[in-house]
Swiss-Prot record:
It comes from Macaca mulatta (Rhesus macaque). Homodimer, and heterodimer with NLGN1 and NLGN2. Interacts with neurexins NRXN1, NRXN2 and NRXN3. Interaction with neurexins is mediated by heparan sulfate glycan modification on neurexin. Interacts (via its C-terminus) with DLG4/PSD-95 (via PDZ domain 3). Residues 1-202 are extracellular. It is a single-pass type I membrane protein. Glycans are attached at N50. It is found in: Cell membrane; Synapse. This is Neuroligin-3. Keywords: Cell adhesion, Cell membrane, Disulfide bond, Glycoprotein, Membrane, Synapse.
Length: 202
């Protein structure tokens, strides 16, 4: 948006520890020990992991990307990916070029033991929230549309039941008062209290 290069990544690796079994996925912040080279030092109180050679290699890769970006704004240069000091063969990151992110292609780097450049991060989940949910919400509004030109007919209140002798009277009610109407009763006062709210009995 402002002309500065943007590089998008998703970290898909985590160290092995008792707190995080092998079948679990990477979580937010799992790249932190790799950024600061913890696998090269060994387990710490903060990161009690069983670091392998692959963890050391991945840490070297991440530190190279981060320091390159800090120096030049491009994680691919000036220092190329090279971890032969850890493995006898080249790692796959040496064959991957981390592309810039743009709204059209939406490329990002999948960082893990099998790195690759992918596009449209979590496209299905993003489409659900950006397109399907708003669409369903708009359908809800369509079915609850209130007309601005059609008036709702007025409801006529029901009349009191009548008998040949006139309105039906409730036993004990004053003469001429229909039985369906409530009578107001006053709640008793408590000691030292003011007037109570009035209730109705049917």
């Amino acid at each position: 948006r402002y002309g500065s290069p943007t590089y998008f990544y998703a970290f898909y690796h985590h160290c092995q520890s008792l707190m995080k079994p092998a079948w679990s996925d990477a979580a937010h912040g799992d790249e932190v020990p790799y950024v600061f080279g913890v696998p090269m030092v060994g387990p710490t109180d903060l990161f009690p992991c069983n670091f392998s050679k692959n963890d050391v290699m991945l840490s070297a890769v991440v530190m190279t990307y981060w320091t390159n970006f800090a120096k030049t704004g491009d994680p691919n240069k000036p220092v190329p990916q090279d971890t032969k000091f850890i493995h006898t063969k080249a790692n796959r990151f040496e064959e991957v070029a981390w592309s810039k992110y743009n709204p059209r292609d939406q490329l990002y780097l999948h960082i893990g033991l099998k790195p690759r450049v992918r596009d449209h991060y979590r496209a299905t989940k993003v489409a659900f929230w950006k397109h399907l949910v708003p669409h369903l919400y708009n359908l809800h509004d369509m079915f609850h549309y209130t007309s601005t030109t059609t008036k709702v007919p007025l409801r006529i209140p029901p009349t009191a039941p009548t008998s040949p002798a006139g309105p039906m009277a409730r036993p004990g009610a004053p003469s001429g008062q229909p039985s369906h109407l409530p009578t107001a009763t006053r709640m008793p006062r408590g000691p030292g209290t003011g007037t109570r709210m009035q209730g109705h009995s049917w």
